[in-house]
Amino acid sequence: MQNAIATIKETNPIVLTVANNVTPADVANGLNALGASPMMSQTPEEADDMVNIAQAAAINLGTLNPHQRGEMEAVMEAAKKYHKPTVLDPVACGATMYRLRVVTELLHQYHFTVIRGNAGEIATLAGVEWQSHGIDAGEGNADLEKVARLAAEKLGSVIVLSGEVDIVTDSTRLARLPYGSPAFKTHVGTGDMLSSLIGAFLATNDDAFDAAVDAVTTFTLCGQAVEDQRPGNWYPGLLNNLDAVTDQQLAAWQ
């Protein structure tokens, strides 16, 4: 990581997020704290204009519905048109046949620069047997590095597999990032925040693998460094750390 955080704080990249209905404020506050500029839309008719002025786009399947799917497709068409990097968060894609069908069709139609999910979600995309548990990772016996590499090879995207140790791979390069905290599980929406924060790093780095590694490292270390890890105090501390963090501070935490 070389001045990645400083670049975001100086350039304020706009990240368009097609959010779910549960965590949009968390996503917006996380982006804003780091120094990026959050933008959200639920209207397919303005997707072209929104993507044109944004530096990256993130799509979240959290509260999937037919209208949201139309917005996703409009955003991805515009991202292809304007050559903007994109992030997919395939929330609970293995939980229902409807979600699996939608995400399969999206991945057939469009290429995503980065895909971030938990073990169950990434295993589903890789075609590996896994017992999903709603939005949570669930259970499985597969080697997670192999699962992530398989998904990257299959989809041609950088894969971020979130867990106790986060895995980032483009199928050739692979990073294991052991900077997490149990507190992340206590606040619904931290995964959504990370997916959109990856967009901010993609906006300022043409190497998608490096950008994803930088994003995961920054976010997880900011969470790990919060002194009070109790749920009610940890989340404000996470935002405070995202706001105050510098490249030098991050290096010291590592």
UniProtKB/Swiss-Prot annotation:
<feature type="binding site">
    <location>
        <position position="116"/>
    </location>
    <ligand>
        <name>ATP</name>
    </ligand>
</feature>
<comment type="similarity">
    <text>Belongs to the Thz kinase family.</text>
</comment>
<dbReference type="GO" id="GO:0000287">
    <property type="term" value="F:magnesium ion binding"/>
</dbReference>
<dbReference type="InterPro" id="IPR029056">
    <property type="entry name" value="Ribokinase-like"/>
</dbReference>
<feature type="binding site">
    <location>
        <position position="189"/>
    </location>
    <ligand>
        <name>substrate</name>
    </ligand>
</feature>
<feature type="binding site">
    <location>
        <position position="40"/>
    </location>
    <ligand>
        <name>substrate</name>
    </ligand>
</feature>
<keyword id="KW-0808">Transferase</keyword>
<keyword id="KW-0479">Metal-binding</keyword>
<keyword id="KW-0547">Nucleotide-binding</keyword>
<comment type="function">
    <text>Catalyzes the phosphorylation of the hydroxyl group of 4-methyl-5-beta-hydroxyethylthiazole (THZ).</text>
</comment>
<keyword id="KW-0418">Kinase</keyword>
<dbReference type="GO" id="GO:0009228">
    <property type="term" value="P:thiamine biosynthetic process"/>
</dbReference>
<dbReference type="InterPro" id="IPR000417">
    <property type="entry name" value="Hyethyz_kinase"/>
</dbReference>
<dbReference type="Pfam" id="PF02110">
    <property type="entry name" value="HK"/>
</dbReference>
<keyword id="KW-0460">Magnesium</keyword>
<protein>
    <recommendedName>
        <fullName>Hydroxyethylthiazole kinase</fullName>
        <ecNumber>2.7.1.50</ecNumber>
    </recommendedName>
</protein>
<feature type="binding site">
    <location>
        <position position="162"/>
    </location>
    <ligand>
        <name>ATP</name>
    </ligand>
</feature>
<dbReference type="GO" id="GO:0009229">
    <property type="term" value="P:thiamine diphosphate biosynthetic process"/>
</dbReference>
<comment type="pathway">
    <text>Cofactor biosynthesis; thiamine diphosphate biosynthesis; 4-methyl-5-(2-phosphoethyl)-thiazole from 5-(2-hydroxyethyl)-4-methylthiazole: step 1/1.</text>
</comment>
<dbReference type="GO" id="GO:0005524">
    <property type="term" value="F:ATP binding"/>
</dbReference>
<keyword id="KW-0067">ATP-binding</keyword>
<dbReference type="GO" id="GO:0004417">
    <property type="term" value="F:hydroxyethylthiazole kinase activity"/>
</dbReference>
<keyword id="KW-0784">Thiamine biosynthesis</keyword>
